[in-house]
Amino acid sequence: MLVVLFTVALLALSSAQGPREELQNQIQIPNQRPPPSGSQPRPPVNGSQQGPPPPGGPQPRPPQGPPPPGGPQPRPPQGPPPPGGPQPRPPQGPPPPGGPQPRPPQGPPPPGGPQPRPPQGPPPPGGPQPRPPQGPPPPGGPQQRPPQGPPPPGGPQPRPPQGPPPPAGPQPRPPQGPPPPAGPHLRPTQGPPPTGGPQQRYPQSPPPPGGPQPRPPQGPPPPGGPHPRPTQGPPPTGPQPRPTQGPPPTGGPQQRPPQGPPPPGGPQPRPPQGPPPPTGPQPRPTQGPHPTGGPQQTPPLAGNPQGPPQGRPQGPQ
């Protein structure tokens, strides 16, 4: 590079010196020519000046000569700048390698990126872990549902009290006595049930011996309590399953006929019995578990309404 710069500078200087010598020779020639007489008219032709001014005119010309060498001087710096230009270009060359250097770091970041992705990979297994807990909750749910299953048996127990509320039906029985006109209104609705209802009522009269026995079957029904639920829908039909208890009713109806005469007075005591039945049904569900002991209590209860009711209505009569 330095050699090139020197050569360029020498060439510029030599080229500048060449015109300088030519200019000097030309200047010397006009300087020598002015002395002749013919030279005077020539100067005005060249510079439109007289003889004396020409010598001054060439003086400004020589300064014009030197400026050219000054001009080439800036040119030589122009020469070196080109080599200087390539110098910045080589740095441009290295920057590309520098550029790839940042790119390689970009390369490693991708591996860093996959690292977070692998954690993303494991999270999915972590995700399924919470899902498995979701899986077990369903079994936990069924655990609660089983308790829901048993409650139905418990539910049927209160529902059996709902069954006894029909015994609250004795309230319609009082209407059987004097208010038959109003009773029929209820009876038509209970029309179908009366057939089964009386059957239940009959077993209630003899239940002391066998009535409690149908109640124990009510005890097992709790698991089938759902069955009493459908019977609850058509309570009239509910008495129909109790008609299955009807075999005891066969004897019960015989007692009910005697109940027929007492109803006029019997219904009056029975209405008070009507309100208690709701409380009565509660002990009756307890009678379900204690069917054996329950019947003992119920027989006197049922026997009292059977025998004494006749006497009691006789009293009010």
Swiss-Prot record:
Superkingdom classification of source: Eukaryota
Start-end of Low complexity biased regions: 289-305
Glycosylation sites: N46
First and last residue of the signal peptide: 1-16
Cellular compartments annotated: Secreted
Biased composition (Pro residues): 32-44, 51-183, 204-288, 306-317
Keywords: Glycoprotein, Repeat, Secreted, Signal
InterPro entries: Pro-rich
Region (Disordered): 15-317
Thylakoid listed as a keyword: no
GO cellular component labels: extracellular region
The keyword tRNA-binding appears for this protein: no
S-S bridge residues: none
PANTHER family with a match to the protein in the record: PROLINE-RICH PROTEIN, PROLINE-RICH PROTEIN 2-RELATED
Protein name, as recorded: Proline-rich protein 2
Native source species: Mus musculus (Mouse)
Gene behind this protein: Prp2
